[in-house]
Swiss-Prot record:
InterPro entries noted in UniProt: Na+/H+_antiporter_NhaB (IPR004671)
Membrane topology: Multi-pass membrane protein
Record keywords, A-Z: Antiport, Cell inner membrane, Cell membrane, Ion transport, Membrane, Sodium, Sodium transport, Transmembrane, Transmembrane helix, Transport
Subcellular location(s) of the protein: Cell inner membrane
Organism this protein belongs to: Pseudomonas putida (strain GB-1)
Pfam family, one: NhaB
Protein name per Swiss-Prot or TrEMBL: Na(+)/H(+) antiporter NhaB
Amino acid sequence: MSRSLTGALAHGFLGQSPLWYKAIICLFLVLNPLLLVTVGPVAAGWALVLEFIFTLGMALKCYPLMPGGLLLVEALLLQMTTPQALYEELQHNFPVILLLMFMVAGIHFMKELLLFLFSRILLGVRSKAILSLLFCVLSAFLSAFLDALTVTAVIISAAVGFYAVYHRVASGANPREDSALDSDQQVAQLHREDLDQFRAFLRSLLMHGAVGTALGGVCTLVGEPQNLLIGHEMGWHFADFFFKVAPVSLPVLGAGLLTCVLLEKLRLFGYGTLMPEPVRQVLAAYAAEDDAARTQAQRIALWVQGLAALILIICLGLHVAEVGLIGLMVIVLITAFTGITDEHRLGRAFQDAMPFTSLLVVFFAVVAVIHQQQLFSPLISWVLTLPTEQQPGMLYLANGLLSAISDNVFVATIYITEVKQAFLNGGMSREHFETLAVAINTGTNLPSVATPNGQAAFLFLLTSAIAPLIRLSYGRMVWMALPYTVVMGGLGWWAVTYWL
């Protein structure tokens, strides 16, 4: 009996994660108290930080909230930080939590409008280079004001919808009835080549769209959660943030869009595949049927969502309230005027954001440990001993390398709080502090496109339903992101070093 109970407990621990992963987490939990007793709190603190980064890097094996949360519960029990310190950290960063709770949910109710826009572009533009550029530009623009994950989710929804329609037609099924999309057994030989080409076409569009969220996300206060966190520390509003970051973000945006066009024209790194004409004909016929069947209520809902989006942009630009509260207003406006009054339909809007919001609390617990043990103080002190003109570039590189394998919010939180403490201690001028803040912000946003671990939108795409359907693997994502990584990361470093 005891053996079966033990087996059930072992099986339930971290669910479907591999056994080796479970063993490593258990090893961490045993090792930390031993390190604390034998070599002291600083070494144990560094071990905890590295262990937490490991859980972020292994996000595809297990969502980091569970293993990271276990590590942080242990840290609290070992008194490496205190519940009060964690509470104060959360209180200080409450605007970021509001953003994730309400803004992401608010954008959820705009999905129909966004899906409509992306669908129109996909079928209305025949040039692949122009189509890719439009996808990248629209993703960048939307991500500058909306949540990057939601924008990515909309692009994925459009891609899944179009893929499903053609896959069913190629399999001889009704395009409006459910079928097994993960199997090609029923696909006629005549359509297999077109289907493979369509997969490559969708892969390139999705990657352009995902990169677009990073290009636009770095530009504004609400583009990424870490932007709001840094802006909050600096006391910057929407316009302040945009102009402070513009010397880096706008040249990188231009270079990123140029890279998009060149990749399509030169057909490098898996880009440049065209949509087969038979596929276009099937999708156009399907879209025409949808347009004809659209009801008056659905048309009104699109207008309401568009008006709410306009109000959102105006409110953000004028900073009429905290970003999260503006998101709550968007929820109220759209739901009130489109008839969404059911509690369960409303609740679904919050499902996407709450896991990451919970994980953010764990981030801040790690930051509380870092503060209490002063883990990063020597590193920041060393950077500040460098000549003033070298400090922004060095911070950019330090942020970029860590952000490529870890979470941007976590990395940005660590560096901005440590640099701010140095500023408060009289270690630099306000002007130089602002320069370093821009270096930290761009360093966490731009080089992180290198891997799916670095960008939440990339990780979301990799773990979505569309990835296996279009044969988008981890390695293929890294390969397709490589030219963007070199251009965005390299130009970002140059701009931070020489143009700020």
